Design a protein with these regions (language model features):
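Extracytoplasmic/periplasmic solute-binding protein
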Residues: 1-23, 64
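Glycine-centered hinge/linker elements that transmit conformational signals in sensory
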Residues: 19-49
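Short amphipathic alpha-helical coupling segments at ligand-binding clamshell hinges
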Residues: 30-37, 118-130, 138, 187-190, ...
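Short helix-initiation/N-cap motifs at beta->coil->alpha
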Residues: 48-61, 72
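C-terminal capping/gating helix-and-loop segments adjacent to ligand/active sites or protein-protein/ligand interfaces
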Residues: 49, 145-146, 164-218
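Paired acidic/hydrophobic, glycine-rich loop segments that form the ligand-binding mouth/hinge
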Residues: 65-70, 86-88
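Pocket-flanking alpha-helical
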Residues: 73-80, 116, 217-220
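Extracytoplasmic/periplasmic substrate-recognition and gating elements
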Residues: 79-142
Length: 225
């Protein structure tokens, strides 16, 4: 859902995503039109809500042609589609009559060391190994976890891996860094409920402006304290 708001110039926690007091700006036409685009998508007979594994099941029986997910579902999707597997960055959608680029939230993991641990040198050495080239290669080989090591990204088989290309293109072209401010913790549950209201048909083209404004006030009341 956030991908639609981000696509239509809505702003999460200021321009750099670090201003908790700024809250989430989905006000006015930009938010309403994003909501209307989601309502239109849900009303399309080709749309399937991926609840309870329906999307994966649909890929398996052929009733679903394309699946919107992430690299965490690679193993299951690859098993089903085999040589027909493909992956790309986020698509564009019509919002307010204009093609807009969907944008995902992007993030990363880090390996940290407790500064108060007893054996600092050993802990640092372990952290360097776990975040290093060899460990990233093992993660890729065993679990298809995409490496960030530039040397690994430049050689086969990583270089030509469709999944790697899709994720990196998404990160570089169709994503924004997910804010790490505390307000994000108060966003997810209301956002999930808003999404469910769209899927359930409670939010329509006729009441999109009203419902988006209610959602806007709700999330910012809890976030901006």
């Amino acid at each position: 859902m956030s991908s639609f708001f981000l696509a239509n110039d809505c702003v999460y926690f200021g321009k750099d995503g670090k201003d908790n007091a700024a809250g989430i700006d989905i006000s006015g036409d930009k938010g309403t039109n994003a909501t209307k685009a989601m309502v239109s998508m849900v009303s399309n007979p080709n749309f399937v809500n991926d609840a309870g594994g329906v999307g994966i099941a649909g890929l398996r029986d052929g009733s679903v042609a394309a699946y919107f997910s992430g690299s965490w579902d690679y193993k299951n999707v690859k098993e089903i589609l085999g040589d027909n597997f493909g992956a790309v960055q986020l698509p564009k959608v019509k919002i307010g009559g204009t093609d807009k680029q969907l944008k995902a939230f992007a993030g990363s993991k880090a390996v940290a060391v407790n500064p108060n641990c007893k054996y600092q040198q050993i802990a640092v050495a372990l952290a360097k190994y776990l975040g290093g080239k060899e460990a990233q290669q093992s993660h890729y080989d065993l679990r298809s976890v995409i490496p960030c090591n530039t040397e690994l990204l430049a050689v086969e088989p990583v270089k030509s891996d469709v999944l790697v290309t899709a994720q990196n293109n998404t990160f570089n072209n169709t994503a924004v860094i997910q804010p790490t401010v505390t307000g994000m913790n108060d966003y997810w549950t209301p956002a999930q409920n808003f999404s469910k209201s769209i899927v359930n048909g409670e939010i329509t083209l006729d009441n999109a402006a009203e419902k988006t404004e209610e959602f806007y006030k709700l999330i910012n009341t809890s976030i901006v304290k």
